[in-house]
Amino acid sequence: MRLVFGEKDTPYEEARVVVLPVPYDLSLSFLPGARRGPEAILLASRELEPFLLELGAAPEEVGIHAAEPVPWVAGMAEESHRLIREEALRHLRAGKWVVALGGDHSVTHPLVQAHREALGDFSLLHVDAHADLYPEWQGSVYSHASPFYRLLTEGFPLVQVGIRAMDRDSLRLARKKGVALFPAHRIHREGLPLDEILRALGKRVYISLDFDALDPSLMPSVGTPLPGGLSYRQVVDLLEAVFREKEVVGMDFVELSPNGQFHAEMTAAQLVYHAIGLKGLQAGWLSREVDHI
């Protein structure tokens, strides 16, 4: 059987990258199932070609270890978030680069907290269909609609790309707090403003990507799909630019809700694997075997 994200089994002690499954979705407000996202991505990753032609390298060669899923406590959001933060922190303190697989988008808050505790300050790049800036949703501050409100109040600089749904209060908050907003409709009309996005980010960046940033024609298996999303090429171009120009301290990919359409899981797995390869090239763990293809 092919192993996840490549053909090489990298022991934890030797791995540079830890893929951390976070199968938590207690805060979803529409379609359920994001708790099955991590397992579906890992299963799909077994079918990927280890060598990525576009990168001219095989990301598996950085040394990838898939950790055990983070446990969570039914009906106890605060305790579940504590467990997520502590598990991420454990891997970070061991010197690993962590890419987390959600789960709903509420998991980003404890993941980012763990990264700041371990690594210091950085800015946030949030790629999503939704702004996720509600102070609370359906009575909970731990909602998947609220993580970036909480992170803003904790002082994180925020850049949002691909947004298609945002209420008036969230827009006012974003303007007040200096959020750099690059909505999907502008990207479709004017092109992807990479130079502006890069200027808005700090030198060190944490990336959080909700799969519903992609158009539902490409990524139907999400909890809250919206038309008018980004293409796979636009997302890859964005990631390549950020990894090329910035130090990416960590990532999460969230909100895949498998519904039997396996092409969505394959797309998600390919995107995660590509990002790991970009980190490998950025950090010098990989070198391009082939240029100018």
UniProtKB/Swiss-Prot annotation:
InterPro entries: Agmatinase-rel, Ureohydrolase, Ureohydrolase_dom_sf. It comes from the Bacteria. Keywords: Cytoplasm, Hydrolase, Manganese, Metal-binding, Polyamine biosynthesis, Spermidine biosynthesis. Binds 2 manganese ions per subunit. The keyword Manganese applies. Its EC number is 3.5.3.24. Its cofactor is Mn(2+). It is found in: Cytoplasm. It is an enzyme of class 3 (hydrolase). Mn(2+) 1 binds at residues 105, 128, 132, 210. Pathway: Amine and polyamine biosynthesis; spermidine biosynthesis. Disruption phenotype: Cells lacking this gene show a significant defect of growth at 78 degrees Celsius and accumulate N1-aminopropylagmatine. The double mutant of speB and speE shows defective growth at 70 degrees Celsius and significant defective growth at 78 degrees Celsius. It accumulates agmatine and N1-aminopropylagmatine. It catalyses: N(1)-(3-aminopropyl)agmatine + H2O = urea + spermidine. GO terms for cellular component: cytoplasm. GO terms for biological process: putrescine biosynthetic process from arginine, via agmatine; spermidine biosynthetic process. Mn(2+) 2 binds at residues 128, 130, 210, 212. One of its GO terms (molecular function) is metal ion binding. In T.thermophilus, the biosynthetic pathways of spermidine operates via N1-aminopropylagmatine without the production of putrescine. Involved in the biosynthesis of polyamines which are thought to support the growth of thermophilic microorganisms under high-temperature conditions. It seems that long-chain and branched-chain of polyamines effectively stabilize DNA and RNA, respectively. Catalyzes the decarboxylation of N1-(3-aminopropyl)agmatine to yield spermidine and urea. It cannot use agmatine as substrate. Belongs to the arginase family. This is N(1)-aminopropylagmatine ureohydrolase.
